């Protein structure tokens, strides 16, 4: 209570003198401290506030911070470790990062700045308790500064207390601490702007963890064999708890961080250097350290990933085990169930969980971190079906709850999609995709397209579109065309329509045989540099078949949905997106004019000429430029005929 009075009504200098006096009392009265120490941490933490600490300077210039930390240090040394640990866990689990900042008065700020200036030159000998890491800490977001300072002190406090708890079963107290940390992370992860800080202090806590050896009073009367068994069991359980905490933190603290593991791999494939601005080196470095630490705890990442892949496949295969799976009604229902099953499975698994299992999302993230750390794949090969099931499992749950939205995880599963399409022969990939159930293929392509269109970073979006394009190239021709057509017809997002229409244009122009054909011709020319009378004549080859062939039905289908698009764009309430889609259609028709039906092109040309004249919108000018090009081609063809 007196803490509250001092903290609310006294000046900074008076608070510093009070804390110094309190520290002296704690040091002089260890017996009393052991009795009442559990009640002090909450009051001490209240001195960590923006009215007491200037968040814009390093903590080494704050005597108040030093005094509070020394008080915690004294509590850790002479307080009752079990009672103090219980208090610390309660404080950690209830600590919140509040996103709204409260402004301090000018008088308080001036008082605070004067105190910092007056004492800055006299505190060198007082700061031994402040480590260099926290002493020079300045939060990226000032809202997080005070909560981060509190959580740092509590972590250090708990770490010291765990070294003093006298018990045969230290895992009991470690479990209590890890549970509190997990609750803190779960509660505050959305407010964390600086994942590196919490990752670092959890890493330090885990790697520095060292339980006290039980005293003779606890071991007396227990045989050596029993003690060894207790020790071995405890050691194994402590490793599980630390691994569980580490993998959980990797999974949750990185959920708002882009990761970019897929971009790193893609740039490597393209023989391009990754832009340093795209990579958060400090976060990647701590991720690499986590990977090393987790694997040092007898966690076999390769086995865990393989198990995760098998489990992911079984989640979706279970849909077909329904006795009604062959009925038409169920086939319609299954298209919706494929989006829901991952979320339902996750909820059921959490409810039924009895053993300590590693966070599966964290396992997937660490499997991708293995590549960024070592430059090699944890699994040298992964089949495309497994990668697709993994992608669906890790992305669809976010449709039903935002707690499963995880950017780093999405980057990791896209990375495995890239691996599956680059480390396996094209023939095997095509066969596997052909055997994939239709409802899985559709849901996968729709999720990948939706996530791509929602991506805010243009470079990341380009990488994702390239991945989608590659997968559509590898899909059966009818599957790819049907997906693109259905997207153009039914998808409510214009950005998605523009993306797939660009892909369709490329797939109707480009051919998988073209590259191989060019290489073959070049090789023949090298072997036969001269065209002599004895030369073997080269038979003319058929024109290469594009990824998607153009026929009357497909031309008519695209023509129909283009007219639907034009009709929407003619309305007074049209958006810029509507005009951009019209422009994309015009680019499509201009690019394919040599392959398209002349009569259909004439109708398109006439519709644009009549409906999209005028000025004021820049897209109209580009639409008419494309239409003029189309008109010139039509006129030329009519003259030739």
Curated annotation (Swiss-Prot):
Report which superkingdom the organism of origin falls in. Answer: Eukaryota
Answer whether the UniProt record assigns the keyword Acyltransferase to this protein. Answer: no
State the InterPro entries in the record: YAP-bd/ALF4/Glomulin, YBP1/2
Q: Which Pfam families match?
A: Kinetochor_Ybp2
Q: Name one GO cellular component term.
A: cytoplasm
Presence of the UniProt keyword Transmembrane in the record: no
Per the record, the GO terms for biological process are:
cellular response to oxidative stress; mitotic spindle organization
Where mainly found?
cytoplasm
Q: What does a knockout show?
A: Increases sensitivity to H(2)O(2) and decreases activation of YAP1-dependent gene expression.
Which cellular compartments is it found in? Cytoplasm
Ordered alphabetically, the record's keywords are: Cytoplasm, Stress response
**Coiled-coil spans in chain:** none
The miscellaneous remark of the record is: Present with 3900 molecules/cell in log phase SD medium.
- Could you tell me what this protein does? Involved in oxidative stress response and redox homeostasis. Required for hydrogen peroxide-induced activation of YAP1. Acts in a parallele pathway to YBP1.
- Per its record, how is this protein called by name? YAP1-binding protein 2
């Amino acid at each position: 209570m007196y803490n509250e009075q001092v903290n609310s009504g006294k000046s900074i200098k008076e608070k510093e003198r009070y804390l110094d006096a309190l520290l002296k009392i704690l040091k002089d009265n260890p017996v009393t401290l052991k009795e009442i120490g559990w009640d002090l941490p909450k009051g001490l933490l209240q001195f960590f506030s923006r009215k007491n600490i200037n968040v814009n300077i390093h903590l080494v210039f704050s005597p108040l911070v030093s005094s509070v930390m020394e008080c915690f240090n004294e509590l850790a040394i002479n307080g009752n470790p079990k009672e103090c640990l219980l208090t610390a866990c309660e404080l950690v689990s209830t600590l919140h990062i509040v996103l709204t900042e409260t402004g301090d008065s000018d008088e308080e700020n001036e008082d605070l700045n004067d105190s910092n200036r007056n004492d800055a030159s006299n505190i060198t000998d007082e700061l031994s308790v402040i480590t260099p890491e926290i002493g020079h800490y300045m939060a990226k977001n000032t809202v997080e500064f005070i909560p981060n300072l509190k959580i740092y002190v509590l972590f250090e406090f708990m770490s010291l207390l765990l070294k003093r708890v006298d018990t045969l079963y230290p895992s009991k107290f470690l479990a209590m601490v890890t549970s509190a940390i997990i609750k803190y992370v779960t509660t505050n992860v959305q407010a964390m702007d600086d994942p590196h800080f919490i990752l670092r202090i959890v890493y330090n806590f885990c790697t520095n963890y060292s339980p006290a050896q039980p005293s003779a009073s606890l071991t007396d009367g227990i045989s050596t064999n029993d003690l060894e068994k207790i020790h071995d069991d405890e050691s194994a359980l402590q490793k599980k708890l630390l691994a569980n905490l580490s993998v959980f933190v990797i999974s949750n603290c990185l959920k708002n961080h882009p990761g970019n593991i897929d971009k790193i791999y893609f740039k490597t494939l393209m023989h391009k250097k990754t832009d340093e601005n795209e990579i958060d080196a400090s976060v990647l470095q701590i991720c690499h350290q986590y990977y090393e630490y987790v694997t040092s705890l007898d966690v076999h990442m390769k086995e865990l990933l393989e198990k995760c892949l098998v489990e992911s496949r079984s989640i979706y295969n279970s849909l077909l085990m329904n006795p009604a799976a062959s009925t038409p009604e169920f086939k319609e229902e299954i298209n919706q169930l494929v989006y829901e099953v991952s979320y339902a499975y996750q909820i059921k698994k959490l409810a039924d969980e009895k053993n300590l299992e590693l966070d599966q999302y964290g396992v997937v993230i660490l499997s991708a971190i293995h590549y960024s750390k070592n430059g090699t794949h944890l699994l040298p090969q992964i089949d495309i079906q497994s990668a697709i099931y993994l992608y669906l499992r890790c992305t669809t749950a976010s449709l039903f709850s935002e707690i499963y939205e995880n950017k780093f995880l999405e980057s990791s599963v896209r990375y495995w999609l890239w691996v599956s399409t680059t480390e396996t022969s094209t023939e095997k990939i095509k066969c596997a995709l052909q055997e994939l159930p239709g409802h899985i293929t559709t849901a996968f392509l729709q999720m990948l397209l939706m996530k791509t269109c929602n991506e805010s970073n243009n470079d990341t979006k380009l990488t994702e579109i390239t991945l989608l394009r590659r997968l559509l190239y590898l899909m059966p021709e009818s599957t790819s065309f049907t997906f693109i057509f259905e997207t153009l017809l039914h998808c409510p997002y214009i950005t998605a329509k523009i993306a797939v229409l660009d892909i369709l244009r490329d797939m109707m122009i480009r051919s998988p045989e073209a590259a191989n054909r060019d290489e073959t011709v070049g090789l023949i020319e090298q072997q036969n540099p001269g065209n002599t009378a004895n030369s073997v004549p080269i038979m003319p080859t058929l024109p290469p078949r594009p990824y998607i062939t153009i026929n009357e039905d497909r031309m008519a289908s695209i023509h129909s949905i283009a007219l639907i698009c034009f009709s929407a764009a003619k309305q007074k309430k049209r958006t810029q997106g509507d005009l951009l889609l019209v422009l994309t259609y015009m680019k499509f028709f201009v690019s394919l004019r040599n392959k398209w039906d002349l009569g259909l092109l004439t109708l398109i040309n006439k519709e644009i000429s009549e409906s999209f004249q005028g000025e004021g919108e820049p897209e109209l000018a580009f639409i008419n430029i494309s239409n003029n090009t189309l008109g010139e081609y039509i006129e030329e063809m009519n003259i030739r005929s």
